[in-house]
Swiss-Prot record:
This protein's name: Small ribosomal subunit protein bS20
Domain of life: Bacteria
Pfam families referenced in this protein's UniProt entry, alphabetically: Ribosomal_S20p
GO biological process: translation
Key words, A-Z: Ribonucleoprotein, Ribosomal protein, RNA-binding, rRNA-binding
The species this protein was found in: Bartonella tribocorum (strain CIP 105476 / IBS 506)
Family per record: Belongs to the bacterial ribosomal protein bS20 family.
Gene3D superfamilies, alphabetized: Ribosomal protein S20
Annotated HAMAP family: Ribosomal_bS20
Protein's job: Binds directly to 16S ribosomal RNA.
InterPro entries: Ribosomal_bS20 (IPR002583), Ribosomal_bS20_sf (IPR036510)
GO MF, any single term: structural constituent of ribosome
Cellular-component GO terms for this entry: small ribosomal subunit
Length: 88
């Protein structure tokens, strides 16, 4: 339980940031899901578009501190690998 006014404010700020981060993480997952759906459909063009939309979105989340940069790099790398396998 927060006892001081500054601690109470910190609790409020954490709750607000949690909501923002949750929304940003959800947005990244949505873009990833769109890529997966395009990949499952076998449509290379739509998969490339979905990948190009996904990459800046996850990097934006990295810059906001939602994901670690290595986590984002790993996800982008794995999706790029799957996209390349589709074209081969």
């Amino acid at each position: 339980m927060a006892n001081t006014p500054s601690a109470r404010k910190a609790v409020r700020k954490v709750a607000a940031r949690t909501q923002v981060n949750k929304a940003r993480r959800s947005r990244v997952r949505t873009f990833m899901r769109k890529f997966d759906d395009a990949l499952a459909g076998g449509d290379k063009a739509s998969a490339e578009i979905a990948f190009k939309n996904f990459e800046p979105e996850i990097m934006r989340a990295v810059s906001k501190g939602v994901f670690h940069k290595n986590t984002a790099a790993r996800k982008v790398s794995r999706l790029a690998k799957r996209l390349k396998a589709l074209s081969v």
